Amino acid sequence: MNKVKKLMSWNAFPALLLFVILLGINGVMTGGLSVSFFRSFISTNAGAICVAIGVTATILVAGTDISLGSIVSLVNVVIVTAFEKGFSVPQAALLGLLTAVLCGMFNGFVVGIMRVNPLLATFATSIAFAGIALWILPYPGGYIDFTFGDWYLGNMFGIIPTPVVLIAILVLIWIFVMKLPVGLHIYALGKDVKKAYASGINVAALRFFVHTFAGLAAGVAGICISANICAGSPTVGSAMSMNSIAAAVIGGVSLNGGIGGIWGGIFGASFLSILISIVVSANLSSIVQSFIQGLILLIGVTVSIAASDKEIKTKIKRAIGGKR
């Protein structure tokens, strides 16, 4: 019983529950859930999950990063250009990853060292990165070696789908960081910036790190998307930044910082992805699709915030019990 209560009090539980419910609905609509469905789901949505992991890290320190979608687009066009220049699959992937990490480091420098507001800083860099992507590849197209796609859709270590391994690498890096003193410092910074400064925590270094990690996550996302579509587009990640923030909130991550974790981002992104899949498969008009997605997203965010906010929980219990 204690384990059940502990699970239900977990910040990411509402997102996990919503995902499982929609997964069941999707199974009913499609006649069942198969291994091929899960492989297709993870290969299609691994990029969104990776971006959600990255933005969650920045939100935990009471910040955000709305440039990750533009970084994904930039990675995509860099990989396309690399293949057109004759680079091999590993070389193109590493070049794309390096580009993303450098973008993340630049964000970390502006936010952490220069102390520019994270929202304003990453809004500016988002426009800059998107502009660079358009300069490199002005229109969709380009060439990506199909062996890149074959590698992505295959298995690593014999049985594990490649997208799962790529996501797991990010998760393991974050878990390792959380085991170190810096993990506690990240949550301390998110809960109270002034106290973090007063206690001697290196705030600039922490913010630099989380934005660099977010850049790495966006780089992995760019690799996933590029390998999955085997084509280039300078706007492929344009909608990912805001969706990833919504995913984090649905996953119980407080926008004020210091509450939640990357599992919330993962389950929140999974929920959004399965929601989009269900709405699209219903063959509704685009207007109705957008309305339903927005409505369910609003409900999901509201439920998650209500479930993770103790004050709101208390008010709901009082309202239900008729107490004032």
Predicted regions, residues:
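Cytosolic-side transmembrane-helix boundaries in multi-pass membrane proteins
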Residues: 1-20, 24, 171-172, 191, ...
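Structural signal for alpha-helical transmembrane segments and their membrane-water exit/capping regions
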Residues: 18-34, 61, 133-138, 175-181, ...
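Single transmembrane alpha-helix segments in multi-pass membrane proteins
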Residues: 21-85, 110-115, 247, 252-262, ...
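Inter-helical junctions in multi-pass inner-membrane proteins, predominant
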Residues: 29-41, 136-138, 177, 210-248, ...
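Transmembrane alpha-helical segments in multi-pass inner-membrane proteins
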Residues: 218, 228, 232-294
